[in-house]
């Protein structure tokens, strides 16, 4: 089957990019590809059998027209000016059978005009982390970019030490970022901001294109998508680590996996990025930061959208987030209805978990085994203060009984939303260390496991992290 590519970005958004081709690596070789995603995108298996090829920037497919996008942004709350694709190149937009498109974005593809002080490269470590994280999030049901392939090489790339240079093929319906809009707003080119908005509506909100109120309705949906995404992050214990405005997806996707982390111990103030000295992007601050970022996006639209309409949309953020978060947390607790004591029960559990540094994922997974008429629970052994747990657990079981639902039905629901497996940093690190020695088996094993996060397992993928795996420091160097 021949793949079809279109050039909408190149044709419709002049002055938002620089056309250029990838710079191949030395002795590049394909070490992993996403068979399931490739099948979904109707990519012929033969493309993965001819060396690095398109996956390593050594060839282009017919119809591809590679370019690097320009955007700007606020980083750690400070205006950073022009940024852009410093090491990534949009190879093309694949036209799918249903008329939608999928960006093929090659990360680590070499220098671009937007590389600033960088070398345009990515390392094997970071490409593995992004591939694992984006696929883990996808199978958890959270909107995200996807990873299609990883290429490694003999080209050394220098970060804290010399590391193998690599490339990641990332795919997404769009790479539109808040930062695209900021770039032209701060250059006082509001007409180009409007062009970006029209492009987004035309291709991703086409049902609004002929509506005279299209900009307000569109921005309201961007707010809602963002609120929903953040609610989902919070419920699975995901910390992004670097929520700069240039890393915010207009479509509400999880974008740009850098120093991310999933909670091990329940620590509301968890900081996964060791460069985040003030804790701006701590786990519990993510909802507030996302709203701040939406406010920056709203500012860029103010030349052609009424400020009252923008503020009305922004005012809806908290309610949308709390609604999604509340629904998801009730499911995690096994509540079939909404009762006034639910928030108190959840907050008391969180307080108990924070005091005891309980494992976030294991606690909710073990809670899924609760029998409403039995005081016995394997979760009890996870707590030192048994009296405090017993007191909470008795009230929790009383709440379950109000719903008049069988244990089996409730447990099935809870186990479908409380994963047994999340991508803990130590699991990623183990796969990385093996891969850097040339052994890709653990990378493939872990990818396979992450496809079934809600299935029970009896291996170390679902155990507490070992001592060496706790508090692994992760930075933006990738």
Swiss-Prot record:
Its cofactor is Mg(2+); Mn(2+). Its EC number is 2.7.7.-, 2.7.7.108. ATP binds at residues 84, 86-87, 107, 119-120, 170, 177, 256. Mg(2+) binds at residues 247, 256. Disulfide bonds: none annotated. The keyword Disulfide bond does not apply. It is an enzyme of class 2 (transferase). It catalyses: L-seryl-[protein] + ATP = 3-O-(5'-adenylyl)-L-seryl-[protein] + diphosphate; L-threonyl-[protein] + ATP = 3-O-(5'-adenylyl)-L-threonyl-[protein] + diphosphate; L-tyrosyl-[protein] + ATP = O-(5'-adenylyl)-L-tyrosyl-[protein] + diphosphate; L-histidyl-[protein] + UTP = N(tele)-(5'-uridylyl)-L-histidyl-[protein] + diphosphate. It comes from the Bacteria. GO terms for molecular function: AMPylase activity; ATP binding; magnesium ion binding. Keywords: ATP-binding, Magnesium, Manganese, Metal-binding, Nucleotide-binding, Nucleotidyltransferase, Transferase. The active site is at 246 (proton acceptor). The keyword Magnesium applies. Signal peptide: none annotated. Belongs to the SELO family. Nucleotidyltransferase involved in the post-translational modification of proteins. It can catalyze the addition of adenosine monophosphate (AMP) or uridine monophosphate (UMP) to a protein, resulting in modifications known as AMPylation and UMPylation. HAMAP family: YdiU_SelO. This is Protein nucleotidyltransferase YdiU. It comes from Shigella boydii serotype 18 (strain CDC 3083-94 / BS512).
């Amino acid at each position: 089957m021949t793949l079809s590519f279109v050039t909408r970005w190149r044709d419709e958004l002049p002055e938002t990019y620089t056309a250029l081709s990838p710079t191949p690596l030395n002795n590049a070789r394909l070490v992993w590809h996403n068979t399931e995603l490739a099948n979904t995108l109707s990519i012929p298996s033969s493309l993965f059998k001819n060396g690095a090829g398109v996956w390593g920037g050594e060839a282009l497919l017919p119809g591809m027209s590679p370019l690097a996008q320009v955007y700007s942004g606020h980083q750690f709350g400070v205006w950073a000016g022009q940024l852009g694709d410093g090491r990534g190149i949009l190879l093309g937009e694949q036209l799918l059978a249903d008329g939608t498109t999928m960006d093929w974005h090659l990360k680590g593809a070499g220098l671009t005009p937007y590389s600033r002080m960088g070398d345009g490269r990515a390392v094997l470590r970071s490409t593995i982390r992004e591939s694992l994280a984006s696929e883990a999030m996808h199978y958890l049901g959270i909107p995200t970019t996807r990873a299609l392939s990883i290429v490694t090489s003999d080209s050394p790339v220098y970060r804290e030490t010399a590391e193998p240079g690599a490339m990641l093929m990332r795919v997404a319906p769009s790479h539109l970022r808040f930062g695209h809009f900021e770039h032209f707003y701060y250059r006082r080119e509001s007409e180009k901001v409007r062009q970006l908005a029209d492009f987004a509506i035309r291709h991703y909100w086409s049902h609004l294109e002929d509506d005279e109120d299209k900009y307000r309705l569109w921005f309201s949906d961007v707010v809602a998508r963002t609120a929903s995404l953040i609610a989902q992050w919070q419920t699975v214990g995901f910390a992004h680590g670097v929520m700069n405005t240039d890393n915010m997806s207009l479509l509400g996707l999880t974008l740009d996996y850098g120093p991310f982390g999933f909670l091990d111990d329940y620590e509301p103030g968890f900081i996964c990025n060791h460069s985040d000295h003030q804790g701006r992007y701590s786990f519990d601050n993510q909802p507030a930061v996302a709203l701040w970022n939406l406010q920056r996006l709203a500012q860029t639209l103010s030349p052609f959208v009424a400020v009252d309409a923008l503020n009305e949309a922004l005012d809806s953020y908290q309610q949308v987030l709390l609604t999604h978060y509340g629904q998801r947390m009730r499911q995690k607790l096994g509540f079939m209805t909404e009762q006034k004591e639910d928030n108190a029960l959840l907050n008391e559990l969180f307080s108990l978990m924070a005091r005891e540094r309980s494992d976030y994922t294991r606690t909710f997974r073990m809670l899924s085994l609760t029998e409403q008429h039995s005081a016995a629970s394997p979760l009890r052994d996870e707590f030192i203060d048994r009296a405090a747990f017993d007191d909470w657990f008795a009230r929790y079981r009383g709440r379950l009984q109000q719903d008049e639902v069988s244990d089996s039905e409730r447990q099935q629901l809870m186990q479908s939303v409380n994963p047994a497996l999340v991508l803990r940093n130590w699991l990623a690190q183990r796969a990385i260390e093996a891969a850097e020695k040339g052994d890709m088996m653990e990378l493939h094993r872990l990818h396979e496991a992450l496809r079934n996060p809600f299935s029970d397992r009896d291996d170390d993928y679902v155990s507490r992290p070992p001592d060496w795996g706790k508090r692994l420091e992760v930075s933006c160097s990738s």
